[in-house]
């Protein structure tokens, strides 16, 4: 089990629970035994030593089960299973639980410092867990409704005094929220067959991705957790077509990238009269959110520049809550944005 001590494994585990998990209440809960489950992508900070003894195939996600019980005459005790193995049994100083509004049934839980129990307490076995896989955190309309639309005239004020981490070339993280470009609502009817979120980075991937289904940048295989479902099946493919991490390998590696697929989508960037002239996309990476015309443009066969037309794409700032959940879903986002506690 996790060892105690300030800065020790026990404290690191507590910080992991507070900083990288959002919870769902298990239907197996009772008035005497409360059970919550969480799943999160592999952490760059907390790396549990399960020695290969966890559930097979669970390498791309961490599944946590928390059991709270209150023995007669004693404080609330807690036990935690990680990928099927008992990792911690303790007495938390406090446990604060808050319901997240919405249909997903999510909970925020804060754990105070863990103490060793004065006397052993009976630890129930972990109940069987299952959940629908690939549960979507937000649909398109919810993304628009819960995010802040940043007008071009307000861009300077919105980014002033903030330090940003660039994710790929088209997403930015300020320590609390993600900033990214999203297709304007008026144009969503132009692409009804696209199931993915209509972020600019996703569009670029659809235009330039390679054919290797195992390519992580293009297809995101084995790096995503089923956060909204509360449990990641060990046999799942770990793919997400909605994650902000998605950007093709070609776009990540080069500043000038040929358009190889779905060329009709270019009309949503350059307009119906000029999109057919565009053969390549040119990136001008920015360390912070900027005008869309300043970070990406089209290039014709003769080398002429074509600007992205105004009004088609909106700069959004995702809410802090959903930014947090999005971060939990993805190994790449964690690796780039969550370096320590």
Swiss-Prot record:
Keywords: Host cytoplasm, Host nucleus, Late protein, Virion, Virion tegument. It comes from the Viruses. One of its GO terms (cellular component) is host cell nucleus. It is found in: Virion tegument; Host cytoplasm; Host nucleus. It holds the Pfam family Herpes_UL16. Its main location: virion. Interacts with cytoplasmic envelopment protein 3 and with the capsid. Plays a critical role in cytoplasmic virus egress. Participates in the final step of tegumentation and envelope acquisition within the host cytoplasm by directly interacting with the capsid. Upon virion binding to target cell, a signaling cascade is triggered to disrupt the interaction with the capsid, thereby preparing capsid uncoating. Belongs to the herpesviridae cytoplasmic envelopment protein 2 family. This is Cytoplasmic envelopment protein 2. It comes from Equine herpesvirus 2 (strain 86/87).
